[in-house]
A protein has these predicted regions:
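N-terminal hydrophobic/helix-forming segments and targeting peptides
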Residues: 1-368
C-alpha cells in the first residue's frame, strides 16, 4: 500500500494548483476526477456539478457513510469593465482589508492561465462588496472571471501546510486519501461515498441542492470534512477535531458515534493518536445543509490559521493547518468507514449501559 503521508500530501498539493471560487471550480473538479480515476474509484456528477464517488461495502444492511467537502474558496468575480480597470464582486466571506488598495490578486482565465493584478480600492457602496482591479498588463477580459488572492498554491513549511485555500482543499484531499486507502485495503461494511461539492462559500449551495435531491440514501451518515478556525479546545497540532456542531446546528450523536468509535480503535492500536472534540461555532459547514433535509450528520475539522486568508493586523496571507492534524484526519475517516456497524459500542455508551450490581442493589435497598 502506498505510504499514507506521501499520498495525502501529493493529493493536496495537486489540488492546490487549481485556484477556484464559487461556481468556477473546474480546475479542482478536473483534478478530483483525475485522482479518482487513478485510484480506480467509481464516481459520477449530479446535475449541479457535485462529484460523488462510491466505494461499495460488504453488508447491504449497514448504514452508508458519506464524507463531504467543498471545492471552492472565497475570492472575487469580475463582473464588468471600468476606465480604471475591472469591477469585481466579492464571492463569499473575505477579510475587510480585501477591499483596500494594493491587495495582490490573480485573475483566472478560461485556459487556466493567471493574470496578475491588484485591487485599487472599493467600488460603489460598501454594501455592494465590490472593488476595482488593475492588471499589471492591461487587457480586455470577458466576465465572469474568478479572482483569487496572489498567495502560494501549496507549501510544506516545517509542520505547517500553507495554501491559499486550505479551506476546503484539505477536506477534499483527506477524502481522496481515504478512498484510496479503502480501495486498496479491507472493504468497509457499508457503502462509502466521497462527496465534493460546489459553491459552499456562498451559502452551502451545492450541498443543499444535493441533499434536497436525495442523491444519497436517506439512512446515510454524513460527515463534513472542513477546515475551521482555531478555538480554545481546537488547537493546531493536537489532532483533527470531532465537530459536535457549527454556528447553526448541533449534530447527531448517532453519526458522531462512528467517529468516536474510530478514535477509540485508533487509540487501542496507537495510544499516541491525537484527536479533539469541540463545538466549532466559528462558521457553518455542510453537515448543517444535510441535517436540514433529515440526514444524520457529524463532522471533522482541521484547526485553521488565517481563516479565509485573514491574518493579524489586516494582512492577507495563506491559510495553514498542522500536518499531523491533516494526516490524523485521514486516519480517522478511514477507520470510521470500518466502524459504522460497531458505532453503538463506544466505551462511553457501554459504561452507561452497564450499571454495577452493587449500585443496582443499593438503589433497590434505599428506594424508600
Amino acid at each position: 500500500m502506498t505510504d499514507l503521508k506521501q499520498r495525502a500530501l501529493d493529493y493536496l498539493s495537486r489540488l492546490g494548483g487549481n485556484p477556484a471560487t464559487a461556481f468556477r471550480e473546474e480546475g479542482v473538479a478536473s483534478t478530483v476526477k483525475a485522482i479518482l480515476r487513478e485510484i480506480g474509484a467509481r464516481f459520477e456528477q449530479d446535475a449541479f456539478g457535485n462529484i460523488i464517488a462510491k466505494v461499495p461495502g460488504t453488508d447491504p444492511s449497514a448504514n452508508p457513510l458519506a464524507v463531504v467537502a467543498h471545492m471552492d474558496h472565497p475570492g472575487f468575480e469580475i463582473t464588468g469593465s471600468h476606465p480604471d480597470g475591472h469591477i469585481a464582486t466579492a464571492m463569499g466571506g473575505i477579510p475587510p482589508s480585501s477591499f483596500e488598495s494594493g491587495v495582490p490578486v490573480q485573475v483566472l482565465l478560461p485556459d487556466g492561465s493567471r493574470v496578475n493584478g491588484a485591487t485599487t480600492g472599493r467600488y460603489g457602496e460598501e454594501s455592494d462588496r465590490q472593488v476595482l482591479i488593475k492588471l499589471e498588463q492591461p487587457q480586455d477580459l470577458e466576465p465572469p472571471l474568478s479572482v483569487v488572492f496572489d498567495l502560494i498554491d501549496y507549501e510544506l513549511d516545517g509542520d505547517m501546510i500553507r495554501m491559499r485555500a486550505v479551506d476546503d482543499l484539505a477536506g477534499c484531499g483527506s477524502i481522496l486519501a481515504m478512498i484510496a486507502q479503502l480501495t486498496e485495503g479491507d472493504a468497509s461494511p457499508g457503502d462509502v461515498y466521497g462527496v465534493f461539492t460546489r459553491a459552499e462559500e456562498v451559502g452551502l449551495v451545492g450541498a443543499r441542492l444535493m441533499a434536497d435531491s436525495g442523491t444519497l440514501p436517506p439512512d446515510t451518515l454524513v460527515i463534513s470534512a472542513e477546515s475551521s478556525r482555531t478555538l480554545p479546545g481546537a488547537e493546531q497540532g493536537e489532532g483533527p477535531v470531532i465537530r459536535v456542531g457549527d454556528a447553526g446546528f448541533t449534530f447527531t450523536a448517532d453519526a458522531e458515534s462512528v467517529l468516536i468509535r474510530a478514535r477509540e480503535t485508533l487509540n487501542e492500536r496507537d495510544n499516541g493518536f491525537k484527536c479533539q472534540r469541540q463545538l466549532m461555532s466559528g462558521g457553518t459547514c455542510e453537515a448543517s445543509a444535510f441535517a436540514v433535509f433529515g440526514y444524520q450528520t457529524t463532522g471533522i475539522a482541521f484547526p485553521l490559521g488565517n481563516y479565509h486568508n485573514g491574518a493579524p493586523e489586516g494582512r492577507i496571507e495563506a491559510e495553514y493547518i498542522h500536518i499531523d492534524d491533516y494526516l490524523g484526519g485521514v486516519k480517522l475517516l478511514t477507520e470510521a468507514a470500518h466502524c459504522v456497524s460497531d458505532r453503538t459500542n463506544t466505551a462511553f455508551r457501554q459504561r452507561l449501559r452497564e450499571v454495577p450490581a452493587d449500585m443496582r442493589q443499593r438503589m433497590l435497598d434505599t428506594r424508600g
